[in-house]
Amino acid sequence: MKKLLNYISFLSVVLFSVACTSSTIEDENAPSEVTTVFYKNADELAATYDPSNTVNQTLRNQIYDLYKQGKWSELESVFKVNNLNGGWPPANGGYNIVDNTDFTAGQKYDRYSGAIGTYSGTGAPTLGGNFTSPIINGYVYTFAQRALNKPENAYDFYYEIEVLNNLLPFKGQSADIIPWFGQVGKGKQTMWKIPLDPSTGYTKTWNKLAQEGYIKITIKKSPSGNYPSAVGMVIQ
């Protein structure tokens, strides 16, 4: 009886080991989530994280291979070890990139941010930035799917941006979101190629685009809790 129990125990260990090995092989051979590689080579991708051109070719090639294979945790580790891009991911945080997308009337997007400059809590905050997530058929991506670098309650504002017409004089770039900063990612993002404001020399703010009649902004939440009176405010 003792020999039988020992044999059963041995067999269980063997079967478990085989199952784990099989699972590992399946994971290694799983198809990449990256189905469209926007960057044609390692140097094109490097332009998104190495503007000073200091990263050697061997490391560039390694990063490019990990990016194409969708090995996000390994890629983030490489960035941390080599202190790259201030900790941010390459490719503006996106994969399966589609460039020069149009903005059409009725489309809605959302984002988290603070105000530009000092905000006293009176009047409309000045809101800037150019990365959003699309709201598709009413679906709002979770905070974790956005893979942002701060906790949700660190952001003063969560707001919705509605496109009012087909007249925006610039395009966008859409992508799936790279998992990063301990967040699951894999949501969708749209980068707005917003031009400079001649009066300031900086990228136009969302307020400026609203003033020009292209968009409407609605502040939905103050995740930080700092500005509850701003919730429901419409900037147009």
Label the model's feature ranges:
Residues 1-8:
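Bacterial N-terminal signal peptides that target proteins for export
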Residues 3, 24, 53, 96-99, ...:
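Intrinsic disorder/low-complexity signature
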Residues 8-17:
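Bacterial N-terminal signal peptides
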Residues 17-37:
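Bacterial Sec-dependent N-terminal signal peptides
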Residues 30-94, 98-101:
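N-terminal export/targeting and maturation segments
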Residues 72-236:
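Catalytic toxin/effector domains delivered as secreted proteins or via bacterial secretion systems
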